Amino acid sequence: MARLLAAFLSGSILAALTPFVAQAQAPAPSGSLPEGPGKEMVQGACTGCHQTNEILRSSGYTREGWKELTSTMIDLSASPAESDQLTEYLATHFPPNDKRQPKLMPGDTHVAFREWKTPTLGQRSRDPVQAMDGSIWWAGQWANLIGRIDPTTGEMKEYALPPNAMPHTVVLDDAGHVWYTGNKNGTVGKLDPNTGKITEFKMPDPKAKDPHTAVFDRKGILFFTLQLSNMIGRLDPATGAIKLVTMKTADARPYGIKVDADGFLWVACNGAPCLVKIGPSTLDLTEVKLPTPGTTVRRLDIAEDGMIWYVNSGKGKIGRYNPKTGEIKEWGSPSGPQSHPYAIAVVDGIVWYNESGQRPDALVRFDPITERFQSWPIPSGGVHAGIIRHMRPTRDGDLLIHQSSTNRIIQVTPSNRAAVR
């Protein structure tokens, strides 16, 4: 083992890991791995980016499953002996289990999943969005890049970003530029796909450290959340001017953001039981208090009828807020209070979201008229290890999702898309 550990510390495995460990924040240690051959290697190869509890609480895999999962993060092809010992340790101590199995609900809708595996290992591909030409853009947060897929050919291209940008999301403007949030360097950036030129817009306040989720309004103004900074931002692309406003509630942690039909912004609070309505010109904030203590909201979406749908991540529910009447109604997610609903999208009156606390991550369909749920396990290559952190519809009514742990971008096509019920 001493020889193997020395090989890890000085050799190819460390070289494979270096770009990602250097850019990822070191997680706080938690839990302890069982003793056995390969423990030191797992500690070195895995816990540079992941908390130990992520391994301890995993759904477990066969030897082949662990090999596939680790291959999405580090390249061990030049070190087969070390690769074998790594996967053997993980398979021995963390075999398949059903500790976090979702409660899958049957129904009449069928869905097809189409997957793309992004090129750079360990990038945590996320937040895919469709461009006007049908291409798909994504953020490779941990590898400091954004990428493009041509769904017709499968060809992919990745664009390196300025140092330590660590993009949290991507959005597109009407001119075809790709905008990203620099979550670790306090910037918003714009990529011109035709030239490859990147323009950075730095936050005017040093306290504004982490641009998070972004959305354009109908006037072409970019609005964005800053979760840990507890702020909302507005950027005028024509002038580069940025205005910031602090949330009314301390540690509200603004997360998801959407625009309603009247041009108002709506923000989800990931640290408090609230939704926030924002005036686009004044940035005046109006809080909507949600009734259940312990409620936290990762994301929200707005239906065509103006209803605000949100995930109650902290309580394992989805909810609906009527802005005209103030009525709030919530439904428990099928897998229960620990299911942690995360991303959400409303398409043709149907609510789609995921249960990120389960393994496999479950894609859930909810019909507000019948109040019935249906759900599916989300594929992630040959394993079920990822979670969706954001979902957005295509122009045809499909869903674009991802599995960040395995670098998968996925397009979901419901069979009865044309007749939604």
Residue spans of the language-model regions?
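Blade-level signature of beta-propeller repeat domains, shared across WD40, Kelch, NHL, RCC1
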Residues: 385-421
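C-terminal capping alpha-helices of c-type cytochrome domains
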Residues: 75-102, 134, 397-399
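The canonical Cys-X-X-Cys-His
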Residues: 42-52, 86, 90
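Conserved beta-strand positions in repeat-built beta-propeller and related beta-rich domains
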Residues: 137-142, 178-184, 222-228, 265-271, ...
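Electrostatic cytochrome c docking/interface patches
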Residues: 22-41
